[in-house]
C-alpha cells in the first residue's frame, strides 16, 4: 500500500536497514518505480504476470529516462521514477503505446523542475507528490489527454520531450535554459 511505501521510504532515509529494490542506483527511485504499480495492480485485481510486465515497463522507462540525464542531475529522481510508474499504471489500465506517451508528456508537463536538494527524510514527500502525479498522468493518458506541445518544454514527439527534460536536468533550471528550450522547440501543427 501507499502508506507502507511511505513508511519504508522514511525508514530508509533515516538510516534504517530496510531492503528495497534499486533503480538507477537509488532505492527511492526503485520504490517509486515499483510500489505504485504493484499497489495499482492489486487495487485493480490484475493477475501477477500482467503486474510483473507493468513493473518491468515502469523500471525500464525510468532507466531509459535516467540514462539521458547522465551521472549527476539537479532534478529530483522521483520525477523520473514517477514517470516510469505512470507508464506502468497506464499499461495496467489497458493503455498502449499512444496512451503511455501521453502519460509521459503529462508527467514532464507536471513535475519537471522539482529540484534535488540532497537525500533526506523529506524525499518521501517529493515521492508522494510524484506518485500522485503518476496516477493523474495515467488516468489522463488512458483517455488520450495530455499536455500539449504548445506548453512549456513538452514537444509533439515524446523523445524530444525527454531530450528537453534531460537538458533541463543537466544544464540547470535557470530561466534562461527554460526560455531557450521553449523558444527553440520544433513547432507543432496548429491546434484547431
Q: What are the functions of these language-model segments?
A:
Residues 30-46, 86-94:
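Alpha-helical support elements that line or immediately flank enzyme active sites
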Residues 46-60, 64-82, 96-101, 113:
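Phosphate/pyrophosphate-binding betaalpha-module
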Residues 92-192:
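Functionally critical mobile loop/hinge segments
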Amino acid at each position: 500500500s501507499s502508506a507502507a511505501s511511505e513508511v519504508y521510504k522514511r525508514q530508509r532515509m533515516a538510516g534504517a536497514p530496510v531492503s528495497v529494490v534499486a533503480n538507477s542506483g537509488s532505492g527511492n527511485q526503485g520504490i517509486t518505480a515499483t510500489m505504485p504499480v504493484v499497489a495499482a495492480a492489486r487495487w485493480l485485481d490484475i493477475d501477477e504476470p500482467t503486474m510483473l510486465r507493468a513493473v518491468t515497463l515502469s523500471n525500464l522507462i525510468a532507466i531509459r529516462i535516467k540514462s539521458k540525464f547522465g551521472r549527476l542531475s539537479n532534478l529530483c529522481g522521483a520525477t523520473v521514477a514517477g514517470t516510469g510508474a505512470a507508464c506502468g499504471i497506464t499499461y495496467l489500465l489497458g493503455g498502449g503505446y499512444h496512451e503511455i506517451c501521453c502519460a509521459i508528456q503529462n508527467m514532464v508537463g507536471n513535475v519537471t523542475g522539482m529540484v534535488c536538494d540532497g537525500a533526506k527524510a523529506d524525499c518521501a514527500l517529493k515521492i508522494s507528490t510524484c506518485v500522485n502525479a503518476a496516477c493523474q498522468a495515467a488516468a489522463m493518458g488512458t483517455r488520450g489527454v495530455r499536455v500539449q506541445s504548445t506548453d512549456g518544454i513538452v514537444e509533439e514527439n515524446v523523445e524530444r520531450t525527454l531530450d528537453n527534460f534531460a537538458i533541463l536536468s543537466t544544464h540547470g533550471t535557470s530561466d534562461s535554459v527554460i526560455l531557450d528550450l521553449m523558444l527553440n522547440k520544433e513547432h507543432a501543427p496548429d491546434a484547431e
